[in-house]
């Protein structure tokens, strides 16, 4: 079976996370994110160039959990896809826009220090094969 891959995005949370709800009642998270860009120099060093800013949204449980756990300035890694759409600007003109739809999002391990708080394990949740002992093999 082939490896399932998705687009990924990394950067930092540039705005305070905003939680709202769709007409159907689903949670929707919106944040502005920043991405720092660098240029490799001939001597092997890197020079920071411009930082770009983009929109990131998430829905349902991912939105609720991200709103609880992320703050402005946090470094993140997300998996999802880029959504391209048309919107109307302040002058009434239709312009092309894009946003990253995060299906999964978490803190960037390479740039974040944190502690993991795991729930206490039980025998039933400790095994990947839980429940298979009752299955007819």
Where do the language-model regions lie?
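Acidic, gly/ser/pro-rich intrinsically disordered tails
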Residues: 1-5, 18-25, 41-47, 64, ...
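OB-fold and OB-like beta-barrel modules that bind single-stranded nucleic acids
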Residues: 7-14, 33, 72-84, 102
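Short aromatic-glycine-enriched beta-strand elements
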Residues: 19-35, 96-99
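Short beta-strand/loop turn elements enriched in aromatics
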Residues: 30-48
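Short, basic/aromatic beta-hairpin or loop at an interaction surface
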Residues: 46-56
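Beta-rich strand-turn-strand
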Residues: 59-95
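OB-fold/S1-family single-stranded nucleic acid-binding modules
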Residues: 83, 89-112
